[in-house]
């Protein structure tokens, strides 16, 4: 483990009696906390937000914050500060969130509402060019002919950060399981940057801070390239990453070889977490120091998984990129 942040469970938060939800370390790592809304909180939340269909949240962005306030009020106003504290805590920065009673694809709209409420307690979800909304829903099937690895089921989707090919700051990523049929495998893969064995050697390499070109395929609906280095630092000088192997465009032999070595070093890390995410649950991670990916699925002709993602910026004190410092 890197010396940057040793894992120290926040015993005060874990021992505290919370209103409307429970909190515990996940089975995979003390860095990843499991937060579960009680059945009563879930029922009251869905009742109070039933008047607004998801379309209303799409058209009136302030409603996303309103339903966040409803959820926080139901949790005795303990939820928002805990979410912010956890996600900004370098030693943690990740949550697996669920709500008792939300676990079926027939509740897809309710899932979007819940995830939206949580996300807008910490910041605001960015426009997603792939879907044209503040969130994107997409399906993984047994056969895929798309132009990126996002929907390809029979290979590992390598570890990466989101927001590498857009101008907007991407502080957080939310990934929710809406449906799953005939599925085996396909766990979410997570790696905390400070647990990566090779962080120091790559972060101190001369190419770590070189500005590189990033370009997305047509399905992303982004027509222009962006330029930034693989590594930056946060306000305390700690490493953060903006990296995805599919979209970085090395300009020469030196960059290409270094990027290939970086990819191999990430994928062979012994500290990658494999996290099952059942239907109705979602991961919420700090995108600056967590990388995420997906394990391969076992082939099945009727394989189907539907996911929903949101990604955006923290509206509170955050360690944004300090480019070229």
From Swiss-Prot:
Binding site for Fe cation: 160, 162, 292
Cofactor comment: Binds 1 Fe(2+) ion per subunit.
Molecular functions per Gene Ontology: ferrous iron binding; glutarate dioxygenase activity; oxidoreductase activity, acting on paired donors, with incorporation or reduction of molecular oxygen, with 2-oxoglutarate as one donor, and the other dehydrogenated
Domain of life: Bacteria
Any one GO BP annotation for this protein: L-lysine catabolic process
EC annotation from Swiss-Prot or TrEMBL: 1.14.11.64
Keywords of this entry: Dioxygenase, Iron, Metal-binding, Oxidoreductase
EC class name: oxidoreductase
Catalytic activity, reaction form: glutarate + 2-oxoglutarate + O2 = (S)-2-hydroxyglutarate + succinate + CO2
Pfam family, one: CsiD
InterPro entries linked to this entry: GlaH, TauD-like_sf
Cofactor entry: Fe(2+)
Pathway, per record: Amino-acid degradation
Family affiliation: Belongs to the glutarate hydroxylase family.
Subunit-structure text: Homotetramer.
Role: Acts as an alpha-ketoglutarate-dependent dioxygenase catalyzing hydroxylation of glutarate (GA) to L-2-hydroxyglutarate (L2HG). Functions in a L-lysine degradation pathway that proceeds via cadaverine, glutarate and L-2-hydroxyglutarate.
Protein name: Glutarate 2-hydroxylase
Native source species: Salmonella paratyphi B (strain ATCC BAA-1250 / SPB7)
């Amino acid at each position: 483990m890197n010396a940057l942040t040793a894992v120290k469970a926040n015993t005060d938060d874990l021992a505290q009696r919370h209103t409307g939800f429970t909190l515990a370390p996940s089975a995979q790592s003390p860095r990843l906390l499991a937060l579960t809304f009680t059945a009563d909180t879930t029922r009251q939340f869905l009742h109070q937000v039933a008047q607004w269909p998801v379309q209303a949240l799409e058209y009136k962005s302030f409603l996303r914050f309103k339903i966040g306030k409803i959820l926080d009020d139901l949790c005795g106003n303990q939820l928002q500060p805990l979410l912010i504290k956890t996600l900004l805590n370098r030693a943690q920065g990740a949550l697996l969130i669920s709500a008792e009673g939300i676990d079926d694809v027939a509740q897809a709209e309710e899932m979007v509402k819940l995830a939206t409420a949580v996300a807008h307690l910490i910041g605001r979800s960015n426009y997603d060019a792939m879907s044209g909304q503040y969130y994107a829903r997409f399906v993984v099937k047994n056969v895929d002919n798309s132009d990126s690895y996002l929907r390809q089921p029979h290979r590992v989707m390598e570890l990466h950060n989101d927001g590498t090919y857009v101008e907007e700051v991407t502080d957080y990523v939310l990934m929710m399981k809406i449906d799953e049929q005939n599925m085996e495998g396909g766990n979410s893969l997570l790696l905390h940057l400070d647990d990566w064995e090779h962080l120091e050697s790559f972060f101190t390499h001369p190419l770590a801070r070189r500005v590189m070109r990033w370009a997305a395929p047509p399905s992303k609906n982004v027509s222009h390239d962006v330029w930034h280095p693989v590594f930056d630092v946060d306000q305390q000088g700690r490493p953060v990453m903006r990296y995805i192997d599919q979209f970085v465009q090395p300009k020469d032999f030196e960059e290409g070889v270094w990027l290939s070595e970086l990819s191999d070093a990430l994928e062979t890390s012994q500290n990658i977490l494999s996290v099952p995410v059942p239907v109705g649950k979602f991961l919420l991670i700090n995108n600056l120091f967590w990388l995420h990916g997906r394990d391969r699925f076992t082939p099945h002709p009727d394989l189907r998984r539907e996911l929903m993602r949101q990604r955006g910026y923290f509206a509170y004190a955050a360690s944004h990129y300090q480019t070229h410092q």
